[in-house]
C-alpha cells in the first residue's frame, strides 16, 4: 500500500500525519496511519488572534517533535514512505515556509518525491478520510477562519468555486462578534457554548443580501451585532450574552445552510460535504443535516479532529496527486493566496509554474 508523510503548518497548528490507501487508483479510500497536531491556540489567545511571527517561530520549535511522534505512531521510518506531502498555499508565508523547508529536507535526504498541496484541497479530502465510500461529484461547504466557499468537486483535482464570501469569512465573523461580547479567542467555540443557553429568536438580525445566489456577506451581520451591543450599553442594560450569541449564530448558520442546499439542488448533486474549522459548530451541523434530510441529500461531516487544520487531510490530497503521477519540483515555493484553480501549477505536469521566483524563495 502506498504511504505518504504529510506536513501542515499553514497557520497556527503544527501537524504531521502518515496516510495510506486501501484501494488502488482510480478508486480512492484513504486512511490515516497516524496524525499528530500541536495547537498554538493558548499561545495566541493572549493577543486575541494569531500573530504570524510567533506562529512561525513556534513551528520551528515544534515540528521536529511532532514529526517524530507521527512516525512513532505509524510505526514507520521516513525511508519507508513513498512521498512527502506539504501544504504550500494559501496561508501565513512564514508558517508555510517552515513546513516546506522541512518537507524539502526530508525529500532530499531520503530521495522521496515532493508533493505540494493546496490547503483548501486538503479540507475537501477530509471527507474521504471520514467516509471511504465518498466519491465525486459533490458540493463542499468549506467554512473556516479565513475562507467561506461553496466548492463543486467535479472529480479528483477538478474543482469550481460556485459561491464565496464577499467580505468576512464565517470564522472571522465568529471571532469578531465574540470579541464584541468579551468572550475571548478563539470566538467560534465560545459563541457555540454560550448560544446553547440563549434564545435564538430574541434579536432579529440581517442575513446580508448579495446579488449572487450562492455568495455570502457577513459584514452587515457583524455591524448589526455591534450596534445592538452599543445600544444596550447606552441604555445601561446588562448584555444578554447568551441571547445575542444564539441570535447571531442562528442567523449565520441559516444563511450557510440555505445557500448550500439550494446550490446542491441547482447543480443536481446528491452529496454535501461540510468541512473547515467552523464545521465544528453544533448549530451548523444540525441545521445542515436537517435541511439535507428534507431534500433527500446525503451529508458528510468529518469528525471534529478532521474539520480543523490537520496533516491527515493534506496527506490524503497528496496521496491522490501521487497516485495520479503528479509531483512537485524542488523549486516549489509558498503563497499567501492561491485560488483552487491554481492547483495545477504546483505540479510538474501542470507546468511547474509555482516556483520560488513567483512566490518567495523556499528552495534549499
Curated annotation (Swiss-Prot):
Substrate binds at residues 142-146, 175, 188, 192, 281. Its EC number is 2.3.1.234. It catalyses: L-threonylcarbamoyladenylate + adenosine(37) in tRNA = N(6)-L-threonylcarbamoyladenosine(37) in tRNA + AMP + H(+). It is an enzyme of class 2 (transferase). One of its GO terms (biological process) is tRNA threonylcarbamoyladenosine modification. Binds 1 Fe(2+) ion per subunit. Pfam families: TsaD. Its cofactor is Fe(2+). It is found in: Cytoplasm. One of its GO terms (cellular component) is cytoplasm. Fe cation binds at residues 119, 123, 309. Coiled coil: none annotated. One of its GO terms (molecular function) is iron ion binding. Keywords: Acyltransferase, Cytoplasm, Iron, Metal-binding, Transferase, tRNA processing. Belongs to the KAE1 / TsaD family. Required for the formation of a threonylcarbamoyl group on adenosine at position 37 (t(6)A37) in tRNAs that read codons beginning with adenine. Is involved in the transfer of the threonylcarbamoyl moiety of threonylcarbamoyl-AMP (TC-AMP) to the N6 group of A37, together with TsaE and TsaB. TsaD likely plays a direct catalytic role in this reaction. NCBIfam families: gcp_kae1, T6A_TsaD_YgjD. This is tRNA N6-adenosine threonylcarbamoyltransferase. It comes from Synechococcus sp. (strain JA-2-3B'a(2-13)). The gene is tsaD.
Amino acid at each position: 500500500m502506498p504511504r505518504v508523510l504529510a506536513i501542515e503548518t499553514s497557520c497556527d497548528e503544527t501537524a504531521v500525519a502518515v496516510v495510506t490507501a486501501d484501494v488502488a487508483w482510480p478508486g480512492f479510500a484513504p486512511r490515516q496511519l497516524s496524525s499528530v497536531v500541536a495547537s498554538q491556540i493558548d499561545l495566541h489567545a493572549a493577543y486575541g488572534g494569531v500573530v504570524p511571527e510567533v506562529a512561525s517561530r513556534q513551528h520551528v520549535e515544534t515540528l521536529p517533535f511532532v514529526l517524530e511522534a507521527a512516525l512513532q505512531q505509524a510505526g514507520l521510518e521516513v525511508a519507508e514512505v513513498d512521498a512527502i506531502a506539504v501544504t504550500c498555499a494559501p496561508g501565513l508565508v512564514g508558517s508555510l515556509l517552515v513546513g516546506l523547508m522541512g518537507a524539502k529536507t526530508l525529500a532530499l535526504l531520503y530521495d522521496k518525491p515532493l508533493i505540494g498541496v493546496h490547503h483548501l484541497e486538503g479540507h475537501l479530502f477530509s471527507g474521504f478520510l471520514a467516509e471511504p465510500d465518498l466519491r465525486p461529484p459533490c458540493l463542499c461547504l468549506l467554512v473556516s477562519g479565513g475562507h467561506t466557499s461553496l466548492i463543486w468537486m467535479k472529480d479528483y483535482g477538478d474543482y469550481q468555486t460556485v459561491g464565496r464570501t464577499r467580505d468576512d469569512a464565517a470564522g472571522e465573523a465568529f471571532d469578531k462578534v465574540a470579541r464584541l461580547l468579551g468572550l475571548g479567542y478563539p470566538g467560534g467555540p465560545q459563541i457555540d457554548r454560550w448560544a446553547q443557553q440563549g434564545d435564538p429568536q430574541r434579536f432579529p438580525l440581517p442575513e446580508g443580501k448579495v446579488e449572487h445566489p450562492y455568495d455570502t456577506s457577513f459584514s452587515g451581520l457583524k455591524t448589526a451585532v455591534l450596534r445592538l451591543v452599543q445600544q444596550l450599553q447606552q441604555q445601561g442594560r446588562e448584555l444578554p450574552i447568551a441571547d445575542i450569541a444564539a441570535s447571531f449564530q442562528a442567523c449565520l448558520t441559516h444563511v450557510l445552510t440555505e445557500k448550500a442546499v439550494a446550490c446542491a439542488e441547482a447543480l443536481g448533486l446528491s452529496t454535501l460535504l461540510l468541512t473547515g474549522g467552523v464545521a465544528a459548530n453544533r448549530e451548523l451541523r444540525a441545521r445542515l443535516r436537517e435541511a439535507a434530510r428534507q431534500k433527500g441529500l446525503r451529508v458528510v461531516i468529518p469528525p471534529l479532529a478532521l474539520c480543523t487544520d490537520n496533516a491527515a487531510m493534506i496527506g490524503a490530497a497528496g496521496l491522490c496527486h501521487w497516485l495520479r503521477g503528479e509531483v512537485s519540483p524542488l523549486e516549489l515555493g509558498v503563497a499567501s493566496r492561491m485560488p483552487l484553480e491554481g492547483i495545477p501549477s504546483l505540479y510538474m505536469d501542470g507546468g511547474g509554474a509555482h516556483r520560488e521566483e513567483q512566490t518567495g524563495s523556499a528552495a534549499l
